[in-house]
Amino acid sequence: AVPLTIAQLIQLLYNVVDRIYIGHLPGTQGEALTGVGLVFPIISMIAAFTNLFSMGGAPLFSIARGEGDEKKASYILNNTFTMLVITAFVLMAVGYGWERPILYLFGASDVTYPFANDYLTIYLAGTLFLMIGTGMNSFISAEGFPKTGMLVVICGAVINIALDPLFIFVLNMGVKGAAIATVISQFVSMILVLRFFHGNKTLYRISGKYMKLKKVLGIILISSMFVFLVAGCSLVDNLKTFKENDDTADTKEQNQVIVEDD
C-alpha cells in the first residue's frame, strides 16, 4: 500500500511543478498561470478515462490471477491496453478538433487563450504516453511489483522537475517548455512500463493475440457515458465561475464610471 500511495502523491507533482515554475515567469506569470489553469479540467478528463480503465481492469486482473485463470488475466490486461490506446487517440482528435471552443467554454479570454493553447496543443500530443504510462502501471502493481510501479512514477516526476527549468527559463520557451517537459517525462514513463511487460519479470505480455477489439469498443461506449457526465459537471462549474468573475468585472467597471461621473 505504501508504494502505491507514494506513487499517487508523486503523480500529483506533474501539474503542481509546472505551475510553480510558470508562476516565476517574468512579466506574464499571472496570465500564464490562468491559461494553464484552464487546461486542468481537460487534463482531469484524460486522467478520468485512464482511471476508468486501469482501476477497473487491474482488480479484475488480480481476481483472474487468484482464480488461476491465466488466460483470462492476459485478456483483461491486453484489452485494457487496447482501450487506453483507442481512447487516447479519440481524445487527441477531439482535443485538436475543438481546442479553441473548448478553452473558451472553460473561461479563456483573448489574453489567456494563447497561453492555454500553447500548453494544451503540446500536452495533447502526449495523451497516449500519459494513458499507457499511468494506466498500465496499475497492472505492474497488480502483478506483485508495487515498488517497480512506484519507481516508474518517480522517474517520470524527477525528469519533469529537472527539465522544467531548462525548457522554461534556459531555452526561454515559457509555457510551451513546461508542456514539453511534461510530455517527455510521460514518454519515459510509458517506455519503462512497456519495457516491463516485455521483460523477464512479468508473466503477462502485451500481445495482439489477447486483444478483442469488438468487445473493447462496446465497453468504451458504455463506460464513456459516466466520464462525459463528470466532464459535463466540470464544464458547468467552470462556466459558472467564469460568469461570476465576469459579473464582478462588470460591477467594478460600472463603479468606476460612477466615480468618474461624480
Question: Would you name each region that the model predicts?
Answer:
Residues 33-93, 130-149:
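Small-residue-rich hydrophobic transmembrane alpha-helices
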Residues 13-16, 24, 30, 64-67, ...:
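Helix-loop interface residues and adjacent transmembrane-helix termini in multi-pass membrane transporters
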